[in-house]
Amino acid sequence: MTAFTQIEKSAAVPAPTDFGIEGMTCASCVRRVEKAISAVPGVASATVNLATERASVQFTGAPDTGGVLLAIEKAGYEPKVIIQEFGIEGMTCASCVSRVEKALRTVPGVADASVNLATEKGTVRFVSGVDVAAIEAAVRDAGYDVRKAKASGATAEPEDRRELETRTLKRLVILSAVLTLPLFLVEMGSHFMPGVHEWIMENIGMRHNLYIQFALATAVLFGPGLRFFRKGVPNLLRWTPDMNSLVVLGTTAAWGYSVVATFASGLLPSGTANVYYEAAAVIVTLILLGRYLEARAKGRTSQAIKRLLGLQPKTAFVAHGDEFVEIQISDVVVGDVIRIRPGEKIPVDGTVLDGNSYVDESMITGEPVPVQKAAGAEVVGGTINKNGSFTFRATKVGGDTLLAQIIKMVETAQGSKLPIQALVDKVTAWFVPAVILVAVLTFAAWYVFGPSPALTFALVNAVAVLIIACPCAMGLATPTSIMVGTGRAAELGILFRKGEALQSLREADVIALDKTGTLTKGRPELTDIVPADGFEADEVLSFVASLEALSEHPIAEAIVSAAKSRGIALVPATDFEATPGFGVRGAVSGLPVQVGADRAFSGVGIDVSPFVVEAERLGNSGKSPLYAAIDGRLAAIIAVSDPIKDTTPQAIKALHDLGLKVAMITGDNRRTADAIARQLGIDEVVAEVLPDGKVDAVKRLREGGRKVAFIGDGINDAPALTEADVGIAVGTGTDIAIESADVVLMSGDLIGVPKAIALSKATIRNIKQNLFWAFAYNVSLVPVAAGVLYPLNGTLLSPILAAAAMAMSSVFVLGNALRLRSVNPA
């Protein structure tokens, strides 16, 4: 083997792809990972290094990055993956989206890529060893410009760029119109106004008239219209035509034919030396006008994000010594003490140190009533202080603030693809090539079978087919509705963390609710304590509260609060043990103490039947009975009640009005749960459920093919939120519940659930309207442009009318999507 052959062969072998891996601790881990990766189809070899925590993988063909990542995860380790957002400029239709996604996925180390036409962004998931420059190069090689998007919530730069694009298009439209108008008047006036034709013949002459038309049309085509050529021609040469390519083919055909008719008319058959300069120019002008209107409409679709970005102030007054100094918000760090005066926006999240005021949190929660803030209260960046003044300590800054997280959630939802878009992706993959084929067949059919002059008919109809086809409308149909719908939801305090929830929420048949903190305020109150014979109420409460002081459960807080309000002193407890769903046990003053539900006592030989009548009475009144045992003897029955939220009855009624069944899942005993269900009109009750049994409860509700949306707020709700078809977290709940959810209600108000469902239905309905329009437009008008009506009634579609129709089709889709901004679900 020669050196040249060796070099040639080595060059043909693709470079290995590196994967970062976390969690390996020994050589056994290395072998396990190597074995898992080697089992992935297409992997030639895998070498794992424990010290560097990296795997070098050699593929036989195209890298299956996603397969390797999945294999690492299944082996029990965590691959190091980066998710980076890129801005992509120059996309005009769904074919562009498909092309960019395909280009990105061919980059070694890229696991997945999702591109959104409406936001002009691509989200790329790749392994840590991938050079970002390679990803950017792939986009540029596909024929588009790329830039790395900045951190979420940091800047409004994409909007500035969109405004610049809108202004540029406006200038191009004006320039193109100025050049096209005289051309249009001269050509059309000659046809419809005999006086104009005579004036041109006498003062300009036919030959000079053609030269003027040529000059004006050429200026339009290669001036304002040059943007179509810059994108369309390279894509044609790559055999990946897009909408720009259709415009280039159509206008160039009309212009080129006219040039031949002007300067070499002898090459054309007799009677066919007609010019179509005005058609080429008007097509460019109308399509530019459509792009301009489209750009303006796109800007309005992202108004929600712009408003969220505008909530954040630019500066903050931070304590430096004995004075407060104004600094840039980017310079604020955790721990800074910040002063807020009346009317000012709160710059970052924090905890109030001193002062008292009311804060307008409507832009975050959707609730119009200002919330009182005093020492110890949490404040959120972006909210507006009303009439008081206070200082607070910054706890979250930059991308960690709630506002930044909300913006990120909205952007993520806006950039997602719904299942309904799968058909669109399949169609748009072959749409443009199919249109070009139809145009070629149209030209051939008219040239062979058409009336005289056949060449003229063939050219005009083929150009009309190329121009009228509009893949843009199909590509924009879904993402624009998602953008506006999720943005409107954010304004109402409803965050769709996953775009798919927009579609799945409307399909829900059952709304399952956790009780505590969801139906109720989550702040239980001690209402009753009935001691057994030989015990005093305050004595029992002292033992019980001393034990419960070590628990973080809301019921424990209620018991401790009641003891303190009665002036009962607490003593240290030992041997504390909590069993979720049962209760707590420990020792107080050397005596064993146990507090919990009736099921907690059956296994320890303590009979709670003496309180059966009392338990029934308390349960029927909607209170939760608990039992207390001291030194192995039943000491008392205790009742706590968690007040129902004021808006819960209204929310349940609204869900019923939507035709939904409402179910409650609770750990309360059956009697208490049934009492609350009767009070609220809840259809189905799953009671006495242990925390880890909520998943099974959701599964039971799903029997028979029913779709279930589960609403919860606590840590123990997270598995059920994940199991449900749609998980809805109450925004006042725990972080883990919110992370597990598909939808977040920022206000913690259940009335947001019917609002979210109504928005889901409105958005999907809007998407279907857009898709129907986009498909119906192309399916019906492409044949008309080809001339199928000519044999019936002599109707042909002018390329100029085709351009106008195409330009307006995308504008119609965007305009329809913008209607979602005015949706106001009750």
Swiss-Prot record:
Residues reported to bind Cu cation 1: 26, 29
Superkingdom of source: Bacteria
Binding-site positions, Mg(2+): 713, 717
Catalytic residues identified in the record: 514
Binding-site residues for Cu cation 2, renumbered to this chain: 93, 96
Gene Ontology CC, one term: plasma membrane
Keyword tags: ATP-binding, Cell membrane, Copper, Copper transport, Ion transport, Magnesium, Membrane, Metal-binding, Nucleotide-binding, Phosphoprotein, Plasmid, Repeat, Translocase, Transmembrane, Transmembrane helix, Transport
Pfam families according to UniProt: E1-E2_ATPase (PF00122), HMA (PF00403), Hydrolase (PF00702)
Annotated compartments: Cell membrane
UniProt cross-references to SUPFAM superfamilies, sorted A to Z: Calcium ATPase, transduction domain A, Calcium ATPase, transmembrane domain M, HAD-like, HMA, heavy metal-associated domain
Reactions catalysed, as given in the entry: Cu(2+)(in) + ATP + H2O = Cu(2+)(out) + ADP + phosphate + H(+)
PROSITE patterns the record matches: ATPASE_E1_E2, HMA_1, HMA_2
GO molecular function: ATP binding; ATP hydrolysis activity; copper ion binding; P-type divalent copper transporter activity
GO biological process, one term: copper ion homeostasis
CDD domains, alphabetized: HMA (cd00371), P-type_ATPase_Cu-like (cd02094)
Membrane-spanning segments: 172-192, 209-229, 246-266, 270-290, 429-449, 457-477, 772-792, 795-815
Enzyme Commission number(s): 7.2.2.9
Purpose of the protein: Involved in copper transport.
Sequence similarity: Belongs to the cation transport ATPase (P-type) (TC 3.A.3) family. Type IB subfamily.
Protein name as it appears in the record: Copper-transporting ATPase 1
Organism, scientific name: Rhizobium meliloti (strain 1021)
Taxon lineage: Bacteria, Pseudomonadati, Pseudomonadota, Alphaproteobacteria, Hyphomicrobiales
Gene (name only): actP1
